[in-house]
Amino acid sequence: MSYRVKRMLMLLVTGLFLSLSTFAASASAQTGGSFYEPFNNYNTGLWQKADGYSNGNMFNCTWRANNVSMTSLGEMRLSLTSPSYNKFDCGENRSVQTYGYGLYEVNMKPAKNVGIVSSFFTYTGPTDGTPWDEIDIEFLGKDTTKVQFNYYTNGVGNHEKIVNLGFDAANSYHTYAFDWQPNSIKWYVDGQLKHTATTQIPQTPGKIMMNLWNGAGVDEWLGSYNGVTPLSRSLHWVRYTKR
């Protein structure tokens, strides 16, 4: 091989490496960095409220911006209300940016009532032009002495793990967390490891989301919602540590 050919190959390889490095850096820059957010006020640079639509299927309510509010106690409150007979409005808050591997923590109290769910999770999906990847911390209002962990990778779930807490989560604030890494997800309650997953781990960065909603057609999972309103769940702070 001549010197000129070798030189051209070296330049091509170097150019490809630089292009890939630039792409990787760009992809990394598109995800959010570490933050700690106490809910003393609503930070529109970090969060956005779902408003005016329903997820349909098992979600038996319409997301309303008014159902995401801040209290004088330094809390974010997500509410489930009824504007008219058998119609329900619910609350969902989500991050503006997407976030990747790292430690996700929330200090919160779920709502307590049969047929409802209080969630903290990461999500991305087809409407974002990505696979459906999701990592969940969920409280089923029918029994808030337990927490459910779950995750989806390219739409494949069925990884549910229900953990007995030893206390009623609806009565006081506790910290729930998951540490998402390329080869594992570890879930924590008040700093204590409760569950680890190591297979089919999600790879796609997603938005940080939190919501309160009532279900329909999933009575075996949630119990039959009895129409009680208003209901609310509270969040004191959220923290993300990129790593």
Swiss-Prot record:
EC number: 3.2.1.73
Residues of the GH16 domain: 29-243
Record key words, sorted: Disulfide bond, Glycosidase, Hydrolase, Signal
InterPro entries listed in its UniProt record: Beta-glucanase/XTH, Beta_glucanase, ConA-like_dom_sf, GH16, GH16_AS
Coiled-coil region list: none
One GO molecular-function entry: licheninase activity
Pfam families to which the protein is assigned, alphabetical: Glyco_hydro_16 (PF00722)
Record bears the keyword Hydrolase: yes
SUPFAM superfamilies tied to this protein: Concanavalin A-like lectins/glucanases
PROSITE patterns (alphabetical): GH16_1, GH16_2
Cleavable signal peptide: 1-27
Active site (record annotation): 134 (nucleophile), 138 (proton donor)
Note: Beta-glucanases of Bacillus have a substrate range similar to lichenase of germinating barley.
Protein name per the record: Beta-glucanase
Taxonomic path: Bacteria, Bacillati, Bacillota, Bacilli, Bacillales
Name of the gene this protein is made from: bg1
